[in-house]
């Protein structure tokens, strides 16, 4: 996920891109009179002169109908389009037998959820511990229920070293004024990897694997002037959890922390805060705005999401 992540799929009357929450919010703010009720699992639908635009919770945005190219050019979204040739050039690769290396992996959870913190975890899995974690059933957190995550993670923490960082909504909103989402994630991933590297010294991983959310050159540009882990041993790949179990373990630890954070905020402020960014989220946000105001909403939610503007309209 680059701040504006590139993805593909283009046909004569259809185009799918991946946009950041900021991009979706900008489209909604620019075309308020064209907003329609979004379908299930989506956060925004616009109908503009024969063109239908649907933004989904996953970050995917589907453009259907007439005038796609004109709209893309008008809104300066050309850089998001990617030909299959460019895609093949950009596809990263890992060394042979990487999945059996001793690796430190990192992953984040919460960047697509309106309520709750952004959590980043790093986990170190030595080659000796790989069979044990596989036997335990460690896998990508998205493939597990919340209950399974909460049952699994304490056991994982007993077996491997890890580092967990949590960026709570109030601080997130403050930082988001000067840094984009991917810059925040880069700083957190780097810090989680560095702190865990110090924790396991003198042992050192054979490789570092970051669940890729932007191109490596952009990642390092965000970290200019920051101390880094060994760049020569650092790899980036999407769906990192399928390439090494260290990323899967980090994903589970980060997911558990996100769920705990959501529960903690729910208890503190007296609302059952849902995950995701769907219509149920809009309803709770509108209630908070109506009864408690923006000062409380900023403590529990990521305000730059399109949900904030929707909640404001619902409150009225």
Across the structure, where does each feature detected by a protein language model lie?
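RNase H-like, Mg2+-dependent phosphodiesterase core
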Residues: 3-316
């Amino acid at each position: 996920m680059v701040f504006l992540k590139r993805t593909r799929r283009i046909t004569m009357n259809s185009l799918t891109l991946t946009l950041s929450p900021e991009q979706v919010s900008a489209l909604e703010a620019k075309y308020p009179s064209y907003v329609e009720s979004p379908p299930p699992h989506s956060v925004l639908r616009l109908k503009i002169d024969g063109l239908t635009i649907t933004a989904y919770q996953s970050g995917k945005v589907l453009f259907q109908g007439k005038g796609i190219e004109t709209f893309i050019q008008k809104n300066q979204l050309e850089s998001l389009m990617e030909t299959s040739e460019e895609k093949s050039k950009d596809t990263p690769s890992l060394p042979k037998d990487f999945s059996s290396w001793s690796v430190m992996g990192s992953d984040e959870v919460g960047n697509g959820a309106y309520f709750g913190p952004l959590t980043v975890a790093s986990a170190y899995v030595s080659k000796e511990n790989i069979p044990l974690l596989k036997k335990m059933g460690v896998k990508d957190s998205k493939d597990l229920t919340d209950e399974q995550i909460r049952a699994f993670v304490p056991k994982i923490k007993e077996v491997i070293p890890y580092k967990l960082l949590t960026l709570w909504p109030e601080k997130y909103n403050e930082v988001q004024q000067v840094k984009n989402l991917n810059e925040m994630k880069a700083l957190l991933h780097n810090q989680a990897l560095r702190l865990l590297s110090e924790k396991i010294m003198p042992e050192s991983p054979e490789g570092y694997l970051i669940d890729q959310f932007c191109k490596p050159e952009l990642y390092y540009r965000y970290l200019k002037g920051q101390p880094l882990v060994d760049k020569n041993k650092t790899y980036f790949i999407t769906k990192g959890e399928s390439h090494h179990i260290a990323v899967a373990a980090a994903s589970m630890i980060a997911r558990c922390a996100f769920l705990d954070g959501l529960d903690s905020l729910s208890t503190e402020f007296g609302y059952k805060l849902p995950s995701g960014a769907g219509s149920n989220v809009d309803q709770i946000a509108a209630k908070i705005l109506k009864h408690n105001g923006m000062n409380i909403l900023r403590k529990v939610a990521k305000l730059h999401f399109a949900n904030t503007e929707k909640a404001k309209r619902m409150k009225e």
